[in-house]
Amino acid sequence: MAMSSFLINSNYVDPKFPPCEEYSHSDYLPNHSPEYYSSQRRESTFQHEAMYQPRSACSEQLYPSCQSSGHQAAVLSPRGHVHPPAGLQSHLSEPNHPCEPGTPSPPPSCSQNSLNQSPSNSSCKEPVVYPWMKKVHVSTVNPNYSGGEPKRSRTAYTRQQVLELEKEFHYNRYLTRRRRVEIAHSLCLSERQIKIWFQNRRMKWKKDHKLPNTKIRSNPSSSSASLQIPPAASQSRSSGPASSL
């Protein structure tokens, strides 16, 4: 019914559309000239140059020896490629030698420091060996000594040492361990030397005063004979009560 009314009614105006050429994009988007794109490229190159500036500064700090004051600076293209000046092209054609960064030399080793020290410092650091710390009864040090019991030699006391020992013996014929250590330190002798000297001095003192030697034991047969009762005394005791009877 609707279609028939549409076809019958001839007063209906048919809509008309503009041609397709009028709907081109040029009406809505402006046409840009080639200068517009060239300006954009220039802006992008400026941004790249700003980004590469700190890296160029770092290269100047790391390799100061590779730069020369007489040469011109390299030109940076918009693409980021470096174009050297015309004067440097002949030099760049030759084989380039790697530039080594300037690094500080390493400090000398401890062995070199020890060798450079003066002999006076080394002598001061040597440990002090006192006479009482050395081995007793060894006259000379043999470098070819391979071991075994060293040969003992007689100790030669000085006059001052003998005088001090005689003074001590006059007051005390027997020394304590503490006093023996004190005398050994004061006279630069060992405890064994002090002990042997006092033993010999006591033997000499007993001999001068005719005292018996306490170290020599008496004969057991003589002591037992002295304890036995003589036979004459035993006979007199047995005959006494018989005569009274």
UniProtKB/Swiss-Prot annotation:
DNA-binding region in chain numbering: 150-209
Matching InterPro entries: Antp_homeobox_Deformed_sf, HD, HD_metazoa, Homeobox_antennapedia, Homeobox_Antennapedia_CS, Homeobox_CS, Homeodomain-like_sf
Compositional bias per record (Polar residues), positions renumbered to this chain: 215-227
Annotated compartments: Nucleus
CDD domains reported for this sequence: homeodomain
UniProt-listed SUPFAM superfamilies: Homeodomain-like
UniProt keyword Transcription, yes or no: yes
Gene3D superfamilies (UniProt xref): Homeodomain-like
One of the record's GO molecular function terms: RNA polymerase II cis-regulatory region sequence-specific DNA binding
Transmembrane parts of this sequence: none
Chain positions covered by the region annotation Disordered: 31-52, 69-122, 208-245
Swiss-Prot/TrEMBL GO biological process terms: anterior/posterior pattern specification; embryonic skeletal system morphogenesis; positive regulation of transcription by RNA polymerase II
Keywords for the protein's UniProt record, in alphabetical order: Developmental protein, DNA-binding, Homeobox, Nucleus, Transcription, Transcription regulation
Top-rank taxon, per record: Eukaryota
UniProt KW tRNA-binding keyword: no
GO cellular component: nucleoplasm
Main localization category: nucleus
Composition bias type Low complexity, residue spans: 110-122, 230-245
Motif placement: Antp-type hexapeptide: 129-134
Family per similarity comment: Belongs to the Antp homeobox family. Deformed subfamily.
Function comment: Sequence-specific transcription factor which is part of a developmental regulatory system that provides cells with specific positional identities on the anterior-posterior axis.
UniProt protein name: Homeobox protein Hox-B4
Organism listed in the record: Gallus gallus
